Amino acid sequence: MSLYRRLVLLSCLSWPLAGFSATALTNLVAEPFAKLEQDFGGSIGVYAMDTGSGATVSYRAEERFPLCSSFKGFLAAAVLARSQQQAGLLDTPIRYGKNALVPWSPISEKYLTTGMTVAELSAAAVQYSDNAAANLLLKELGGPAGLTAFMRSIGDTTFRLDRWELELNSAIPGDARDTSSPRAVTESLQKLTLGSALAAPQRQQFVDWLKGNTTGNHRIRAAVPADWAVGDKTGTCGVYGTANDYAVVWPTGRAPIVLAVYTRAPNKDDKHSEAVIAAAARLALEGLGVNGQ
């Protein structure tokens, strides 16, 4: 085990380490992430949780970052929660017109004449980040305020969704609209995929949708061996270097890891980097003593 890995793990578990002050430990833990930020030219927020030991890795974990499309995972979870009280909801057909097809609606645009079921829209929103599908589901839940209310109901006081696709992608620095924190995202994801926030059948459906995501191969998934199961949801705003990914990772022979990586940059034309997200995920996994790649 590397010195860095030991220090991160010890710091996160709040164990004393002779010869190191708390400040020295914090600096040693933060240094690799700070270097990655310097190379990126922006800010990186990370929160990772080992559900077996309870250890965590945290860097800018309480700061707000734009959600971009990552809200769509929680949107699908909210739909599943409602389906627990509303029998047949997932099989309900939703018809929509051409005016619903905002840019990047790769699945919903194929079914303009037939419509899609709520379950099909949910899968499209999670696995293909389909924007029209997300807006149609938001409408069913009472808009952005309805999704925010669902997140409050599971104990998340940080998440807020204020706008619809595509407006929510503005990612203006300092704007609290349509944001959350890496820690809040990770903790909510844990509740929904591994905890009791959803009943068992709905929880399994949510996990299956996340595992089937097609947009995250170069983000957190790139930081783990190919034979580990991963369920994730990405987001990319397209401005201010803003992108993200959150995931549940099932390492072979140990308890799941839940983590979130969010990025932002100061200038509107700054580019996001999938490689930076993958690198941050590797650092977080290393800090938890997990051998990624």
Swiss-Prot record:
EC number(s) per entry: 3.5.2.6
Gene Ontology molecular function: beta-lactamase activity
Binding-site residues for a beta-lactam, renumbered to this chain: 69, 72, 104, 129, 131, 234, 236
Catalytic activity entry: a beta-lactam + H2O = a substituted beta-amino acid
Record GO biological process: beta-lactam antibiotic catabolic process; response to antibiotic
Superkingdom assignment: Bacteria
Cysteines engaged in disulfide bonds, as pairs: none
UniProt cross-references to SUPFAM superfamilies, sorted A to Z: beta-lactamase/transpeptidase-like (SSF56601)
Pfam families per the UniProt record, alphabetical: Beta-lactamase2
InterPro entries according to UniProt: Beta-lactam/transpept-like, Beta-lactam_cat, Beta-lactam_class-A
Signal sequence range: 1-24
Catalytic residues (positions): 69, 167
Regulation: Not inhibited by EDTA, inhibited by clavulanic acid and tazobactam. Inhibited by cyclic boronates, including vaborbactam and bicyclic analogs of taniborbactam.
Gene3D superfamilies: DD-peptidase/beta-lactamase superfamily (3.40.710.10)
Similarity-based family: Belongs to the class-A beta-lactamase family.
Function, in words: Class A beta-lactamase which confers resistance to the beta-lactam antibiotics, including penicillins, cephalosporins and carbapenems. Acts via hydrolysis of the beta-lactam ring. Has penicillin-, cephalosporin- and carbapenem-hydrolyzing activities.
Protein name: Carbapenem-hydrolyzing beta-lactamase KPC-2
Source organism of the structure: Klebsiella pneumoniae
Gene: KPC-2
